[in-house]
């Protein structure tokens, strides 16, 4: 899969958000997501129905509709960039969403909004993998599984209670297992 082009991965139903999403000058958020959706589905995305869906999803994320006409992530705060990634995920509706440090640098309100966006998205037909070093987002999401990864190796797996154990012991307690 690593050798596949990004658009092939997207067509296969894989979405990846990044810790520090890049800006794309000259491309509006609306145009970017609509083009991505069209490319992934292989169908022409009708403007009117797309605008309705975009507004609905932006409202859910407390994201002002004016951001749809701004260039992707240009001048966005860290929280706005993360909300934009959750917006993309919710509209593109992948089978697997990999969220890399989605909670990094977010204030309490932004963590709540992003967490709620992930909860609305997640269902029995998709999966969400959250990569994080902090437990704040995990407390809100209540993960089914928690894995501790040290030096590229999963050294411990558990349920949501493992988050509390990590909080108490710290990651150093797991380094010997690697």
Regions found by a protein language model. Name each.
Residues 19-24, 133-134:
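Catalytic "switch" loops of ABC-type ATPases
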Residues 22-95:
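ABC-family P-loop ATPase nucleotide-binding domains
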Residues 1-9, 73:
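ABC ATPase NBD Q-loop/coupling interface
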Residues 145, 149, 153-176:
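Conserved beta-strand-loop-alpha-helix hinge in the C-terminal portion
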Residues 125-141:
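Conserved H-loop
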Residues 98-102, 109:
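Walker B catalytic motif
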Residues 111-124:
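Helical segment within the ABC ATPase nucleotide-binding domain
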């Amino acid at each position: 899969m690593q050798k596949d082009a990004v658009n092939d991965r997207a067509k296969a139903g894989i979405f990846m958000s990044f810790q520090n999403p890049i800006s794309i000058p000259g491309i509006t958020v609306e145009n970017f997501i609509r083009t991505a959706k069209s490319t992934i589905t292989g169908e022409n995305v009708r403007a009117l129905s797309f605008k309705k869906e975009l507004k609905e999803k932006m409202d859910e994320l407390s994201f002002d509709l004016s951001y749809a006409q701004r260039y992707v992530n240009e001048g966005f705060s860290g929280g706005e960039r993360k909300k934009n990634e959750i917006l993309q995920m919710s509209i593109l509706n992948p089978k697997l969403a990999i969220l890399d440090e989605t909670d990094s640098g977010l204030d309490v309100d932004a963590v709540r909004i992003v967490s709620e966006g992930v909860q609305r998205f997640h269902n029995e037909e998709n999966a969400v993998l959250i990569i994080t070093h902090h437990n704040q987002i995990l407390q809100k999401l209540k993960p089914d599984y928690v894995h501790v990864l040290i030096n590229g190796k999963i050294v411990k797996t558990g349920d949501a209670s493992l988050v509390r154990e990590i909080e108490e012991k710290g990651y150093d307690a797991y380094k010997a297992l690697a």
